Every structure is written in structure tokens, then in C-alpha cells.
Swiss-Prot record:
Keyword vocabulary terms for this entry: Cell inner membrane, Cell membrane, Ion channel, Ion transport, Membrane, Metal-binding, Sodium, Transmembrane, Transmembrane helix, Transport
Catalyses which reaction(s): fluoride(in) = fluoride(out)
Keyword Phosphoprotein: no
Biological processes annotated in GO: cellular detoxification of fluoride
Superkingdom of origin: Bacteria
Protein's membrane topology: Multi-pass membrane protein
Originating species: Azotobacter vinelandii (strain DJ / ATCC BAA-1303)
Transmembrane portions of the chain: 1-21, 34-54, 62-82, 101-121
Location in the cell: Cell inner membrane
Cellular component annotations (GO), alphabetically ordered: plasma membrane
Keyword Membrane: yes
Activity regulation annotation text: Na(+) is not transported, but it plays an essential structural role and its presence is essential for fluoride channel function.
One of the Pfam families matching this protein, by short name: CRCB
Designated name of the protein: Fluoride-specific ion channel FluC
Amino acid sequence: MIGVTLAVAVGGALGCLLRFATSNWISAHWPQHFYAATLAVNIAGCLLIGYLYGQFLLRPEVPLALRAGLIAGFLGGLTTFSSFSLDTLRLLESGQAPLAFSYLAFSVLGGLLATWAGLILTKL
């Protein structure tokens, strides 16, 4: 378990560093489009999690430390949007469309409301 934990920690650090570098680069080149960094890492993270998930389904022998390090660690550090997208896709694939769309709506609206609430808390 130590190996898996270490893989997640290292992957997370690398994902965070890539997100930070992406944000800095985009801010330096297109400061008026600050949101582009988040959009870029979210879309890239979704592409990568879909690819990795597919590869890991085809290759169940891939060690847990590598799977966890890449998905929970690297992509978790880069973006949590990729995990959210995969969860939604898996619900749809398993025939649970109503739950998938409820999860989608609650996640987006809940995230927006929680972000707003956090902002409001700073003003108290």
C-alpha cells in the first residue's frame, strides 16, 4: 500500500506542477483569457482519463500503483474534472442515465453553489 500511496503522491505533484505551468504560460500569453488554462487542463484530463481507462480495461495486469498514480495522482492533481467525467460516463454505460444526469446536474450546480458559498464566507 505504501507503493500505491507514493505513486499517487508523486503523480499528484506532477499533475499540480503541470497545471501550474499551464496556467502561468497562458496567463503570460493571453491574460484576458485566464479561464483557458482551466479549460485546457480539464479537456486534456478528460482525454487522458478516457484513454487510460480504456487501456487499463484492456490490460488488467497493469499494476495498481501505476493505475492509481496516473489516474488518482497525476490526473487528480491536474484536474478533478476528468474523474467526474469518467464517473458520469460509467453511469451512462451501465444504463443508469437518470442517475448520470442527476449526478451531472448536482455536480455542476453544487460546485457552483459551493464556490459561491465559499466566496460569501470570506465576506462574513
